[in-house]
Amino acid sequence: MTETFRIHWYAGAANRFGAVPKDLVSLCDPGFVEVARNGASIPASALVAAQLRRTAFGAAMEKLLAKLDFIVSPATAIPAFAVPPEVPSNVALDRSLYSSSFAFPINLSQQPACSTPCGLTAAGLPIGLQFVAARGADAKVLSAARDFERASP
């Protein structure tokens, strides 16, 4: 699913970047500009194929979530890190997807999700917990996150 998400993300960035006036391009985040420029070279056939995979994945997630109240997972794959890098510099994976490996599949499948704090690392960095539910169950996700926060201040 990483490649499917990357195609959607990069093509979407290219579309957004195309609307940025030339005199404002220098104000854009360099990482966004790089992603948008890479996205501009994605063939339409690759985007259509990615859309078909996205639809199939969304249907599979709906089938799974018809049997479950929620999927609960970490919010991110790694602890918080200093900004501005998208991920720590020692990470060899695609820097735009590495830290969001639990979130991007849910964005791709279009299920509602909510991340809530659930603790701290040994270094005092925040850890998040992600609640995911079936499409249309936005209020259910928000309620679960609220209930968790109340029970775990």
Show where each model-derived region lies.
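Short, surface-exposed loop/helix-turn segments at secondary-structure junctions
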Residues: 5, 49, 80-100
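Short helix-loop capping/hinge segments that flank enzyme active sites or metal/cofactor-binding pockets
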Residues: 7-62, 112-125
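Short, basic, helix/turn surface patches
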Residues: 12-28, 100-101, 137-150
